[in-house]
């Protein structure tokens, strides 16, 4: 079919560019929305094309530890597959699990900069509470340092990842519209 032919062409095109991820934004569907379950069904039906998928929910908010706060930190809701998709590793702790997503556990994984800037170190950040938009989350993991040059506000180590189910609730967004496939 035309769609399968186009998908094959696109897959070859992405492979030739060295790109192994594709972002999908579902917008302008005035009569209906596409649910997370429907996107997972699409993903499962196309496992020959995709190894992983994650919904992405961006949260614009402040993160705090006591009186220390950051407005430059990127806060995102992701799935349990995100760490592997980003080809990153944990410095300490564990990553978000499927059970965290289903039960909307208020847990998060932070970047190296956040651990040092707000807590003074990786070990000091682990199992501590971080306020995200006024909500208390427990830090369950710290991602290994990404930026070899310097740790800086707004840099590649300045992020917090939480279960996408929590992020969707925080943003009062019942319809997640951004997904990444790998």
Regions found by a protein language model. Give the residues of each.
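Long, amphipathic alpha-helical coiled-coil
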Residues: 1-3, 178
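Short aromatic/hydrophobic contact patches that present stacked aromatics
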Residues: 23, 178-180
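Hydrophobic secondary-structure segments that place a key small or acidic residue at a functional site
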Residues: 56-57, 68-178
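Hydrophobic, regular-secondary-structure patches
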Residues: 3-74, 81-84, 117, 168-171
